[in-house]
Amino acid sequence: MENYNVKTRAFPTIGIILLGGISDKKNRIPLHTTAGIAYTGINNDVYTETKLYVSKDEKCYIDGKEIDLNSDRSPSKVIDKFKHEILMRVNLDDENNLSIDSRNFNILSGSSDSGAAALGECIESIFEYNINIFTFENDLQRISESVGRSLYGGLTVNYANGRESLTEPLLEPEAFNNFTIIGAHFNIDRKPSNEIHENIIKHENYRERIKSAERKAKKLEELSRNANIKGIFELAESDTVEYHKMLHDVGVDIINDRMENLIERVKEMKNNFWNSYIVTGGPNVFVITEKKDVDKAMEGLNDLCDDIRLLKVAGKPQVISKNF
């Protein structure tokens, strides 16, 4: 039965307008508009690879570890919705099941998005893309609230208000060809995303955060129309500052002393060449430079983090093989 399978590859993500606050733990619709990019390594070696296959018993493996099918954000919540129709396409009855095996490669942050998008691409390809992508995105958000960033690739904006959510592409990856993202990683535990979502909404200025995100999204659309890549990443840096100040105010600190030291070095380097930085919810500082300045930036950052990767903006998911 495992002969019926599809394998896909999708790319993790980095926030540009950062997400904080979701409707509930089941549906995970963002409470405000956000934006982000998909990324991979400069040698295309950063991705999630997922196989969806027909099996006797339903199983879900992530990086070789079997996960509880009833756990929060379990892929089975999405698979079960489409199981009957998928099995019908290969003339199998509901006594059969669908399982997934998903593996992450060299990902610093954003693997939930790429995992959800890779599963989504598996399902879409079986239906030959004859599926309502807007409602389907909402299904996949039950796994990862910002999955749209990986579903479309490039730069995207997600318009949301806690009840409805819609992602639209703004720029293709090629628009970023003259820029490199340096991923500076620190070997510390990351905060669970739910800790961020549950606490940031307690901030006294959270309503203003919602308005600020809307204003930034409009600005991002304008910057994208003009292909102003520096402006896009400068907006991202300003949003990082606002976001992490709010998190600090409610007792959730993502940026530790070592990360702060690296950020200070990034600011110093601005005197010599253009750069910008982003910190999302994990133990990473993403530093963006023009390609011509990468060596200078690397020289200044190498001794301040535990690992460093060269990254680039990535595209949408890909089907690697299919037998359905």
From Swiss-Prot:
<feature type="binding site">
    <location>
        <position position="193"/>
    </location>
    <ligand>
        <name>ATP</name>
    </ligand>
</feature>
<keyword id="KW-0414">Isoprene biosynthesis</keyword>
<comment type="similarity">
    <text>Belongs to the GHMP kinase family.</text>
</comment>
<keyword id="KW-0808">Transferase</keyword>
<dbReference type="InterPro" id="IPR020568">
    <property type="entry name" value="Ribosomal_Su5_D2-typ_SF"/>
</dbReference>
<keyword id="KW-0547">Nucleotide-binding</keyword>
<comment type="function">
    <text>Catalyzes the phosphorylation of mevalonate (MVA) to yield mevalonate-3-phosphate. Functions in an alternative mevalonate pathway, which passes through mevalonate 3-phosphate rather than mevalonate 5-phosphate. Also able to catalyze the formation of isobutene via the conversion of 3-hydroxyisovalerate (3-HIV) to an unstable 3-phosphate intermediate that undergoes a spontaneous decarboxylation.</text>
</comment>
<dbReference type="InterPro" id="IPR048471">
    <property type="entry name" value="M3K"/>
</dbReference>
<keyword id="KW-0418">Kinase</keyword>
<feature type="binding site">
    <location>
        <position position="149"/>
    </location>
    <ligand>
        <name>substrate</name>
    </ligand>
</feature>
<keyword id="KW-0067">ATP-binding</keyword>
<dbReference type="GO" id="GO:0005524">
    <property type="term" value="F:ATP binding"/>
</dbReference>
<feature type="binding site">
    <location>
        <position position="190"/>
    </location>
    <ligand>
        <name>ATP</name>
    </ligand>
</feature>
<comment type="subunit">
    <text>Homodimer.</text>
</comment>
<feature type="binding site">
    <location>
        <begin position="109"/>
        <end position="112"/>
    </location>
    <ligand>
        <name>ATP</name>
    </ligand>
</feature>
<feature type="binding site">
    <location>
        <position position="19"/>
    </location>
    <ligand>
        <name>substrate</name>
    </ligand>
</feature>
<dbReference type="GO" id="GO:0019287">
    <property type="term" value="P:isopentenyl diphosphate biosynthetic process, mevalonate pathway"/>
</dbReference>
<dbReference type="InterPro" id="IPR048470">
    <property type="entry name" value="M3K_C"/>
</dbReference>
<comment type="pathway">
    <text>Isoprenoid biosynthesis; isopentenyl diphosphate biosynthesis via mevalonate pathway.</text>
</comment>
<dbReference type="InterPro" id="IPR014721">
    <property type="entry name" value="Ribsml_uS5_D2-typ_fold_subgr"/>
</dbReference>
<dbReference type="InterPro" id="IPR036554">
    <property type="entry name" value="GHMP_kinase_C_sf"/>
</dbReference>
<dbReference type="GO" id="GO:0016301">
    <property type="term" value="F:kinase activity"/>
</dbReference>
<protein>
    <recommendedName>
        <fullName>Mevalonate-3-kinase</fullName>
        <ecNumber>2.7.1.185</ecNumber>
    </recommendedName>
</protein>
<dbReference type="InterPro" id="IPR053859">
    <property type="entry name" value="MVD-like_N"/>
</dbReference>
<dbReference type="Pfam" id="PF22700">
    <property type="entry name" value="MVD-like_N"/>
</dbReference>
<feature type="binding site">
    <location>
        <position position="145"/>
    </location>
    <ligand>
        <name>substrate</name>
    </ligand>
</feature>
<dbReference type="Pfam" id="PF21433">
    <property type="entry name" value="M3K_C"/>
</dbReference>
